[in-house]
């Protein structure tokens, strides 16, 4: 944040009062408004500049006085209006008793906001407490609010410098140089205003502003707390169960509570209804996880002067509601007089009826508001004003007196939903503006913060072929006494258009009508007169309309808001659990079907697994078909009539697609997602798998055999063996497309699905053009020849054509080829929270089975087994990457695209950081051996000869009898201690010599260590029978690095003789150890039995034979 440097003032004027404070000290209220007259601003600016220059010439010292951000208060002498302050916070309580001389008046500057927060402290802080944060030429300001709940601004010391004063030229006089300096300051001020505005919005959790209207004197931008509003999906059963489980159910039925909330009237106009006030403002101070804060409903509007008595009642905000913040930024470029601004948030419903809206059927489209809420914005209830050019007289103003209440956005009761004329909705909003009440807006940015809470019972944004539910934020006002007509600047940003929210009324209407009705109803004939052809091009701009008689200019802008329904969280609900079906069909076929999830996002691929196991030998499966059914139903506004989306095709015999739809013998739309069959001909699907090597067109038979039961000379008949199969693939759920007027005529009507084939690049190469020799003319003209024969024969692999895996029980490979298709019409979202527009889906798996007739075994009877389960399609923004928490591997990654594990990360100084200890290591006893358990990160072993622990030993039984320590069958391997390198000979074969012999000893050490770390098998010495492992540095006079020399060079391998090998074999067991019992007399004489370890280990790595152990047992007897 920028620092502020203040001008030098007189020596005795470090705490001087400005003219504003002098007037206030006499009890005269002062109301500096950003809408003050321009003439008075210029006079005050000129007089202030002259006074500053005179004070500088009279020898003012470089005494820095704090710069103060204008604050406004409620109550007191200002009568609740905006109040500007140019004094230090320390003098707030002393300004009535202290009167400085006129020449000691300082030239205050504007403080820049670093972080703005809410505070309940009412004690003002002395300015002397900030002296430790001041530097030469830079000043930090920390001003406390004057009232409880007020906001204040604070400047941090690590901010950039923004100088509005000429400290470096304190002896300068007023001259023509001030004009050039003012231009520079104006440019810097404009850049600073943009940065300050963005930080102001960011501090309140808002995104960057988006321009919706711009011309030469006005720009309107919208900033929201998110690109979309995400409403949670909460089942009534789960909600009631969780409430009872947590003890939060007070006996009130949910339906009764919803009816009570919907029964509150919402009035439109200047007195909006259902204003809500947040009672708990502390962040994170929620009552419990289901009750975050409280809203208070009242019937008062946003007018600060409203004297109506509040009639409030508390409404709980639970986890099902979503808070949303909206900021309207009105940037005025020239002094302009505007009326009050009408801001409306509404949800529009449009439903097209094919045969007309019943019962009258005089019109074909329903158009009404499902919810609506209005605000009145003017120069008295803004939250922040940033002037175009910041000066001592034009300072930033934060309106603390504005207390815009948080309001609950919910559905309008059914009886209050009235039909609207879509051609007059904009005019109706403009006509509600009071032209007699105007305000003069000075150049600058006006920020209006609008908090909203969305109820969970409102519908999400819906896009269907004959219905739309969209959310709009609309702003309307009028510019008074504007000369000339201001058209929208061609270089200015265009209004925001959302591709999924049907932003244009004309495109929406054409999409509604032309998508489904071109084959069901004749289009209206357009007159051929010249006026009819050009009348649509004679309208004015959709954002600005001019009234020539009254001198008023209409300003209108709108911003789309997308509301998305999210799937229920897996942590608190079981609604999104995986689907698993396990059944047996007529004691003939057992099938298992598993589907990963129940809530599926569009444009995603979900794995599915199907397992078929025949129970009888004569069952035959010809085809497996997976599809999704979609049913769309519309209900009239009064819940009296309804019709399905497929009725225009299903109930019109003259429709060219009528027979195609009737052949399906079902009323819903069905989209084929996957099909596996044995013949080329079949139903079109998004993915088609054709099996090539099945026997007798049976998907369960792949290994036939010859029938030898016929003893006659007839040819042998081949019989097929039915066996279980497992099919694994991924189902893709394509998203719908926003159809315009042209594309709506190309695709078939709803209910008839057409597909477009996707070419297979693997087949394209095989069936490519023949290789011709390059011609002489082509060579002379510089054309390159065709690819060589080797390059064209290079195989092409496309993974999307190999996603299906079919496994047979016999292990024989199943040969298939794949076909992929793309539907011309995708799938639509589920709509289960709006009673007038209803859309639901089901996943269906169809098995076509053939089985011999029980009465006539020679005849086959064919069956179609249908398994269906409901699924829910949600927005593509609700995919697993956005809804689920990141995995541990993702969280430990150093960067987004970096695949470096945590163990390879570096600290601040660039040193390699070791991985954190595992759970087993953290809870292990400090005195116990340091053991790296299985599944934990490997730890470099310690080779202290005094540690007699299992760290240097092997728990594997195989390697415990593989030979003594240091023994190797390979003469080329050095006779070193195996415990210090690896015991992988028995498990992974002998160790390569390259791990020991290397031109660089460092590489050899690294390889040896890697081998030692990766080997988890160690000797077991728990019974104290094995000898102490001899370290390498004792037996070979080398460093502890596994017997490798520290000097640069190769390692010399001594020739291992037979005697040395035999001597080293004794190190495996303790000296004198034998499996036979030693007699007392032999012990006294020092004679060791012949059946010692030497005889047992005479065969190297082989264990002792039975004939060697039997004599030992006989000797004992």
Swiss-Prot record:
<feature type="cross-link" description="Glycyl lysine isopeptide (Lys-Gly) (interchain with G-Cter in ubiquitin)">
    <location>
        <position position="651"/>
    </location>
</feature>
<dbReference type="GO" id="GO:0033554">
    <property type="term" value="P:cellular response to stress"/>
</dbReference>
<dbReference type="GO" id="GO:0070086">
    <property type="term" value="P:ubiquitin-dependent endocytosis"/>
</dbReference>
<dbReference type="InterPro" id="IPR011022">
    <property type="entry name" value="Arrestin_C-like"/>
</dbReference>
<feature type="modified residue" description="Phosphoserine">
    <location>
        <position position="1035"/>
    </location>
</feature>
<protein>
    <recommendedName>
        <fullName>Protein ECM21</fullName>
    </recommendedName>
</protein>
<feature type="cross-link" description="Glycyl lysine isopeptide (Lys-Gly) (interchain with G-Cter in ubiquitin)">
    <location>
        <position position="577"/>
    </location>
</feature>
<feature type="modified residue" description="Phosphoserine">
    <location>
        <position position="527"/>
    </location>
</feature>
<feature type="region of interest" description="Disordered">
    <location>
        <begin position="1079"/>
        <end position="1117"/>
    </location>
</feature>
<feature type="modified residue" description="Phosphoserine">
    <location>
        <position position="115"/>
    </location>
</feature>
<feature type="compositionally biased region" description="Polar residues">
    <location>
        <begin position="11"/>
        <end position="34"/>
    </location>
</feature>
<feature type="compositionally biased region" description="Low complexity">
    <location>
        <begin position="117"/>
        <end position="130"/>
    </location>
</feature>
<dbReference type="GO" id="GO:0071555">
    <property type="term" value="P:cell wall organization"/>
</dbReference>
<feature type="modified residue" description="Phosphoserine">
    <location>
        <position position="18"/>
    </location>
</feature>
<feature type="region of interest" description="Disordered">
    <location>
        <begin position="63"/>
        <end position="155"/>
    </location>
</feature>
<feature type="cross-link" description="Glycyl lysine isopeptide (Lys-Gly) (interchain with G-Cter in ubiquitin)">
    <location>
        <position position="794"/>
    </location>
</feature>
<feature type="cross-link" description="Glycyl lysine isopeptide (Lys-Gly) (interchain with G-Cter in ubiquitin)">
    <location>
        <position position="1024"/>
    </location>
</feature>
<keyword id="KW-0832">Ubl conjugation</keyword>
<feature type="region of interest" description="Disordered">
    <location>
        <begin position="1016"/>
        <end position="1065"/>
    </location>
</feature>
<keyword id="KW-0961">Cell wall biogenesis/degradation</keyword>
<feature type="modified residue" description="Phosphoserine">
    <location>
        <position position="140"/>
    </location>
</feature>
<dbReference type="GO" id="GO:0005737">
    <property type="term" value="C:cytoplasm"/>
</dbReference>
<feature type="compositionally biased region" description="Low complexity">
    <location>
        <begin position="70"/>
        <end position="81"/>
    </location>
</feature>
<dbReference type="GO" id="GO:0030674">
    <property type="term" value="F:protein-macromolecule adaptor activity"/>
</dbReference>
<dbReference type="GO" id="GO:0071230">
    <property type="term" value="P:cellular response to amino acid stimulus"/>
</dbReference>
<keyword id="KW-1017">Isopeptide bond</keyword>
<comment type="similarity">
    <text>Belongs to the CSR2 family.</text>
</comment>
<feature type="modified residue" description="Phosphoserine">
    <location>
        <position position="286"/>
    </location>
</feature>
<dbReference type="InterPro" id="IPR050357">
    <property type="entry name" value="Arrestin_domain-protein"/>
</dbReference>
<feature type="region of interest" description="Disordered">
    <location>
        <begin position="275"/>
        <end position="312"/>
    </location>
</feature>
<feature type="cross-link" description="Glycyl lysine isopeptide (Lys-Gly) (interchain with G-Cter in ubiquitin)">
    <location>
        <position position="807"/>
    </location>
</feature>
<feature type="cross-link" description="Glycyl lysine isopeptide (Lys-Gly) (interchain with G-Cter in ubiquitin)">
    <location>
        <position position="712"/>
    </location>
</feature>
<dbReference type="GO" id="GO:0005829">
    <property type="term" value="C:cytosol"/>
</dbReference>
<dbReference type="Pfam" id="PF02752">
    <property type="entry name" value="Arrestin_C"/>
</dbReference>
<keyword id="KW-0597">Phosphoprotein</keyword>
<feature type="modified residue" description="Phosphoserine">
    <location>
        <position position="550"/>
    </location>
</feature>
<feature type="compositionally biased region" description="Low complexity">
    <location>
        <begin position="501"/>
        <end position="519"/>
    </location>
</feature>
<keyword id="KW-0963">Cytoplasm</keyword>
<dbReference type="GO" id="GO:0009267">
    <property type="term" value="P:cellular response to starvation"/>
</dbReference>
<feature type="region of interest" description="Disordered">
    <location>
        <begin position="1"/>
        <end position="48"/>
    </location>
</feature>
<dbReference type="GO" id="GO:0031625">
    <property type="term" value="F:ubiquitin protein ligase binding"/>
</dbReference>
<feature type="cross-link" description="Glycyl lysine isopeptide (Lys-Gly) (interchain with G-Cter in ubiquitin)">
    <location>
        <position position="191"/>
    </location>
</feature>
């Amino acid at each position: 944040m920028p620092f502020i440097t203040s001008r030098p003032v007189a020596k005795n004027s470090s705490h001087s009062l400005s003219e504003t404070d002098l007037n206030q000290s006499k009890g005269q209220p002062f109301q500096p408004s950003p809408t003050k007259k321009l003439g008075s601003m210029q006079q005050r600016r000129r007089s202030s500049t002259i006074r500053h220059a005179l004070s500088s010439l009279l020898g003012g010292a470089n005494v820095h006085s704090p710069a103060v951000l204008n604050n406004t208060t409620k109550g007191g002498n200002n009568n609740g209006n905006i109040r500007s302050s140019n004094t230090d916070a320390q003098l707030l309580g002393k300004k009535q008793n202290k009167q400085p001389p006129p020449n000691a008046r300082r030239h205050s500057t504007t403080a820049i906001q670093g972080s703005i927060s809410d505070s309940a402290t009412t004690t003002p802080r002395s300015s002397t407490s900030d002296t430790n944060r001041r530097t030469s030429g830079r000043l930090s300001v920390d001003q406390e609010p004057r009232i409880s709940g007020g906001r204040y601004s604070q400047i941090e010391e690590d901010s950039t410098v923004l100088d509005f004063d000429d400290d470096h030229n304190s002896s300068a006089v007023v001259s023509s140089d001030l004009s050039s300096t003012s231009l520079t300051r104006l440019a810097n001020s404009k850049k600073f205003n943009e940065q300050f505005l963005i930080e102001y919005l960011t501090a309140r959790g808002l995104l960057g502003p988006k321009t919706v209207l711009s011309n030469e004197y006005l720009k309107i931008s919208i900033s929201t707390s998110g690109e979309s509003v995400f409403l949670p999906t909460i089942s009534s059963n789960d909600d009631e169960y969780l409430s009872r489980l947590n003890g939060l159910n007070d006996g009130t039925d949910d339906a009764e509570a919803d009816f009570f909330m919907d029964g509150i009237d919402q009035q439109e106009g200047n007195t909006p209804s259902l204003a809500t006030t947040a009672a708990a403002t502390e962040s994170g101070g929620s009552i419990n996880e289901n009750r975050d804060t409280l809203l208070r409903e009242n019937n008062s509007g946003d007018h600060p002067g409203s004297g109506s008595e509040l009639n409030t009642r508390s409404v709980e905000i639970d986890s099902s509601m979503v808070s949303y913040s909206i900021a309207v930024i009105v940037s005025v470029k020239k002094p302009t007089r505007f009326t009050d601004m009408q801001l409306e948030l509404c949800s529009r419903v449009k439903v097209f009826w094919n045969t007309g809206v019943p019962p009258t059927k005089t019109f074909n489209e329903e158009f009404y508001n499902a919810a609506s809420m209005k605000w009145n914005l003017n120069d008295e209830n803004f939250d922040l004003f940033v002037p175009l050019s910041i000066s001592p007289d034009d300072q930033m103003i934060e309106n603390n007196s504005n207390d815009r209440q948080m309001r609950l956005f919910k559905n309008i009761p059914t009886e209050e939903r009235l039909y609207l004329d879509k051609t007059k909705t904009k005019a109706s909003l403009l006509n509600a503006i009071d032209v007699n009440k105007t305000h003069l807006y000075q150049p600058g940015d006006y920020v209006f913060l609008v908090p909203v809470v969305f109820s969970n019972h409102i519908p999400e944004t819906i896009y269907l072929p004959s219905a739309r539910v969209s959310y709009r934020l609309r702003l309307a006002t009028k510019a008074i006494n504007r000369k000339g007509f201001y058209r929208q600047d061609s270089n200015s940003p265009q209004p925001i258009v959302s591709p999924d929210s049907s932003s244009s009324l004309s495109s929406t209407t054409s999409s509604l009508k032309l998508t489904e009705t071109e084959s069901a109803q004749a289009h209206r004939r357009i007159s051929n007169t010249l006026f009819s052809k050009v009348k649509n091009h004679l309208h004015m701009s959709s954002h600005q309309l001019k009234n020539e008689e009254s001198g008023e200019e209409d300003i209108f802008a709108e911003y789309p808001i997308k509301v998305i329904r999210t799937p229920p969280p897996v942590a608190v609900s079981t609604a999104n659990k995986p689907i698993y079906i396990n059944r047996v069909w007529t004691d003939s076929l057992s099938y298992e079907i598993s589907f990963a999830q129940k809530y599926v996002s569009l444009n995603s691929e979900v794995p599915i697994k199907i397992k078929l196991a025949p129970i009888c030998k004569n069952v035959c499966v010809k085809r497996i078909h997976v599809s999704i059914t979609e049913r769309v139903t519309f209900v009239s506004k009064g819940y009296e009539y309804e019709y399905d989306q497929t009725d225009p095709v299903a109930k019109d015999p003259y429709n060219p697609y009528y027979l195609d739809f009737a052949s399906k013998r079902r009323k819903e739309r069905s989209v084929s997602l996957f099909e596996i069959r044995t013949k080329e001909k079949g139903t079109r699907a998004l993915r088609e798998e054709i099996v090539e090597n099945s026997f007798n067109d049976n998907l369960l038979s792949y290994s036939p055999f010859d029938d030898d039961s016929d003893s006659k000379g007839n040819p042998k008949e081949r019989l097929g063996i039915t066996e279980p199969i497992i099919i694994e693939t991924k189902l893709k759920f394509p998203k719908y497309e926003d159809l315009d007027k042209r594309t709506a005529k190309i695709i078939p009507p709803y209910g008839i699905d057409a597909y477009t084939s996707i070419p297979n690049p693997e087949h394209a190469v095989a069936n490519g053009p023949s290789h011709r020799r390059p011609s002489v003319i082509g060579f002379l003209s510089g054309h390159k020849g065709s690819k060589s024969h080797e390059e064209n024969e290079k195989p092409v692999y496309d993974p999307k054509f190999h996603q299906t895996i079919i496994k047979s029980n016999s292990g024989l490979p199943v040969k298939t080829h794949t076909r992929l298709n793309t539907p011309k019409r995708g799938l639509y979202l589920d709509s289960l929270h709006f009673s007038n527009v209803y859309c639901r889906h089901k996943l269906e798996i169809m098995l076509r089975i053939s089985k011999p007739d029980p009465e006539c075994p020679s005849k086959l009877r064919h069956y179609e087994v249908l398994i269906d389960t409901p699924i829910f399609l949600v927005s593509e923004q609700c995919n697993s990457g956005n809804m689920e928490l990141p995995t541990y591997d993702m969280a430990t990654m150093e960067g987004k695209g970096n695949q470096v594990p945590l163990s390879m990360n570096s600290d601040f100084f660039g040193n390699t950081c070791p991985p954190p200890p595992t759970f087993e290591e953290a809870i292990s006893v400090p005195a116990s051996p340091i053991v790296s358990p299985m599944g934990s990160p490997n730890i470099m072993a310690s080779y202290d000869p005094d540690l007699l622990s299992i760290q240097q030993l092997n728990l594997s039984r195989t390697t415990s009898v593989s030979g003594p320590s240091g023994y190797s069958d390979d003469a080329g391997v050095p006779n070193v201690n195996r415990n210090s390198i690896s015991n992988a000979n028995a498990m992974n074969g002998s160790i390569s010599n390259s791990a020991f012999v290397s031109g660089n000893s460092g590489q050899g050490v690294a390889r040896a260590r890697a081998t030692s770390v990766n080997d988890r098998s160690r000797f077991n010495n728990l019974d104290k029978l094995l000898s102490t492992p001899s370290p390498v540095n004792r037996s070979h006079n080398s460093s502890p690095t596994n017997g490798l020399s520290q000097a640069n060079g190769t390692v010399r391998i001594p020739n291992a003789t037979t005697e040395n090998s035999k001597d080293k074999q004794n190190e495996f067991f303790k000296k004198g150890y034998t499996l036979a019992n030693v007699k007392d007399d032999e012990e006294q004489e020092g004679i060791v039995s012949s059946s010692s370890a030497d005889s047992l280990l005479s065969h190297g790595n082989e264990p002792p034979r039975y004939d060697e152990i039997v004599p030992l047992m006989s000797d004992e007897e």
